[in-house]
Amino acid sequence: MSIITDILGREVLDSRGNPTVEVEVYTEDGGFGRAIVPSGASTGEHEAVELRDGDKSRFGGKGVLKAVENVNGPLAKEIVGFDTTDQRGIDAAMIKLDGTENKGKLGANAILGVSLAAARAAADELGLPLYEYLGGPNAHVLPTPMMNVINGGAHSDNKVDFQEFMIMPVGAKSVREAIRMGSETFQALKSLLSADGKVTSVGDEGGFAPDFANNEEPLQYLIKAIEKAGYKAGEDISIAIDVASSELWNNEDKTYKLRWSTGEEFTTPEFVKYLEGLVAKYPIISIEDPIDENNWEDWASITKELGEKVQLVGDDFFVTNTDYLRKGIKMGAANSILVKVNQIGTLTESLEAIEMAKEAGYTAVVSHRSGETEDTTIADLVVATNAGQIKTGSMSRTDRLAKYNQLMRIEEQLGDTASYKGINSFYNIKK
């Protein structure tokens, strides 16, 4: 047994300079684990609650001292004495102590910090890498990355409606090669943007955020950048987009409005046709949140229309919650889930969401948040679960590159047993 003897929480900063929670867990035999909790900008309304202080005199109200107090007080009192390898027991005890459906009493940021740090302490105690501790000897699949090289929507200050334009090196043979291909394309894109007089400053997730005339212009630049880097679009590198359509949805008149660019408005059938046209015109392999998070029947309709051609990822739609995922599976809504550990608030629930998705033939994409840190847990998590896809930003900003660097280390550690699926990570669509 490896008994937890001490839990320490503190307030630190994320990649946007906003406060977040860091937790350290100590065991009686010298095991140690540290985790830092990420934070989102575009959040689903059904996400677990991130506890903020609301004190405008500190960090504009975004302080997390209350969450830290909950770590050092009630959560520490509850969890000290647990065997650190009892992840399910630890997480269940914290959920019970909180007593709310959305972890709003103690804060998902407090609970998640303890959950992740406990897992790291257990791995440290056993002398195992985190991915091996969580996934066992079968953890061997390196993920195909979604690299967010152009930012829009809530992640930038430009006039682009879609939140993310991503490249996916589906033709790579290893994660190291995939990262190289992504880096080369990122640099080619920077050169093209600069040559056209567009700014090359980056957004929250490390991608470029210049102004464009419409939502197709970024796609055109991606094609040019892929080719400039020496690759074939749709063969070596495919494109993924995050529409974040809940940001575009007007619930009063039931339309989607391209509010940041052209001002066009679409009914739901028109918006589906609009997206279908983009899929036909560009090598788009994945669309995240193409439909508003509360429109379940419309999600089922777009899945019936496009689900065999393209990966349809539920982010705000599922919020890493197995209750929502179960409903989606039953309705035939979406064919993939985005897994963000802080959307649900514990490691156990994140693992359950991935397992449920895979059992139903859905893909699972393990994801960062726009407010990130140097914590690399999601890199280990995606390998531990053989999920096959990861979304962790662009080829700039250390908070993003930390995850890519960790994936390359893991691939090196796995040696000949490492497997990079590339295009085959999209196992439920016609390729």
From Swiss-Prot:
Co-factor requirement: Mg(2+)
Identify the residues that bind (2R)-2-phosphoglycerate: Q163, K340, R369, S370, K391
Where are the active-site residues found?
E205, K340
**Its Gene Ontology molecular function terms?**
magnesium ion binding; phosphopyruvate hydratase activity
Q: What is its main location?
A: cytoplasm
* Entry's localization field: Cytoplasm; Secreted; Cell surface
Instruction: Tell me the PANTHER family matching this sequence.
Output: ENOLASE (PTHR11902:SF1)
NCBIfam families per record: eno
The family note in this entry says:
Belongs to the enolase family.
Record's protein name: Enolase
Gene name linked to the record = eno
